[in-house]
Amino acid sequence: MNLREMSKLNVPIVSIITGEGCSGGALGLAVADRVMMLEHAYYTVISPEGCASILWRDAARYADAAEALKITSKDLLELGIIDEEISEPLGGAHSDYNVVAENMRSSIVNALNELAKKSPEKLREERYAKFRAMGRFIED
């Protein structure tokens, strides 16, 4: 679906990033009323290895690239790119699917209960404003 068309939907949109959200295609997940992310997932326009290869011509510098890209749920929550970090059990999501599923279910239900109170016009207006506010330019 075209991102412009998705942004015009009259119903609540909730996205959850559960693993690697990497590339321009994954960015479409941000055209939502609520964007959530598992705590050990990452979300970025390019993989850390790809970024390191381009910037430093050395994919081994992926850790430096990951830090610069701010790809973690904690970073993205602080930057306002995502709205919620969903906790995972000790050992990660794969260690207890039932716990992760319940955590995700709870977050989805809470978001939909909140969003259901808004008119379609308000949803579209807030969705547009949220997406347009992403990004930051900092001068030294």
Descriptions of predicted regions:
Residues N110-D140:
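C-terminal alpha-helix plus adjacent terminal tail
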